[in-house]
């Protein structure tokens, strides 16, 4: 029964990120939580927190609906924390994230900095912690720190072959804002490939919209470079003709002098 319940919880999470919100909610609501063991209760709250968080992303720009699902995710996380062993990696990650959601940025940064100092970049928690630290840096206006932590998070995602990611997408957007179109274009292409492979429709519209903007600017930049290259080629061709003409003229003058 516990294996079946775990499967249904994970299925609900996957359904939510794939856009099947009603199916995900029905799956969760059909699960009988009475008699759950401590471990299964922890899995339940972790799954519902993740599911509500994914659902909230669909309502970005619609404050009332976003706040509803976001608050449900935060509430599920508060229920999750007491079920986790204190001091464990999962506990510290969720504690730091909860501090962040409650806008206690200093406490969140303290917990998460301690966490990434003791775990390896190959640990999936490392990427999540670094992404939150990047968001904290962004709230403080520290762009360099934000880029640094987004890069660490993206590298960790790549090492773990994690396809459902946000760090490389955000990093691409940030580099675009700073005028680094080539790297922004490359990173967003990787991000869209990951989105397609993971079937994470919640990320699809965000990444596609950003990629279209960068693609447009990138194409314009490439067109400018091509025009400049044509101008240089024409200029060099004219210089070559002038050089040939000058050599011919000098030879003619030398023959006349001789």
Regions found by a protein language model. Name each.
Residues 1-223:
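A "functional boundary" signal
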Residues 218-258:
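Alpha-helical transmembrane signal-anchor helices
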């Amino acid at each position: 029964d516990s294996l079946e319940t775990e499967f249904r919880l994970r299925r609900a999470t996957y359904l939510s990120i794939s856009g099947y919100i009603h199916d995900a909610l029905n799956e969760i609501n059909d699960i009988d939580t009475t008699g759950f063991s401590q471990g299964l209760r922890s899995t339940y709250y972790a799954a519902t927190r993740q599911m509500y968080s994914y659902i909230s992303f669909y309502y970005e720009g619609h404050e009332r609906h976003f706040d509803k699902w976001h608050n449900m995710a935060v509430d599920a996380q508060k229920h999750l924390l007491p079920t986790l062993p204190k001091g464990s990696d999962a506990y510290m990650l969720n504690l730091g994230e909860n501090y962040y959601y409650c806008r206690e940025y200093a406490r969140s940064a303290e917990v998460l900095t301690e966490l990434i100092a003791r775990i390896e970049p190959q640990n999936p928690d490392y990427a999540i912690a670094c992404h939150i630290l990047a968001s904290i840096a962004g709230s403080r206006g520290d762009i360099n720190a934000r880029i640094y932590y987004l890069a660490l998070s993206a590298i960790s995602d790549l090492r773990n072959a994690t396809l459902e990611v946000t760090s490389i997408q955000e990093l691409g957007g940030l580099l675009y804002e700073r005028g680094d179109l080539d790297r922004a274009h490359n990173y967003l292409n990787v991000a869209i490939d990951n989105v397609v492979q993971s079937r994470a429709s919640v990320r699809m519209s965000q990444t596609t919209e950003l990629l279209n903007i960068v693609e447009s600017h990138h194409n314009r930049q490439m067109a400018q470079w091509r025009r400049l290259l044509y101008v240089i080629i024409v200029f060099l061709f004219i210089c070559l003709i002038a050089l040939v003409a000058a050599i011919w003229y000098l030879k003619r003058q030398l023959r006349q002098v001789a």
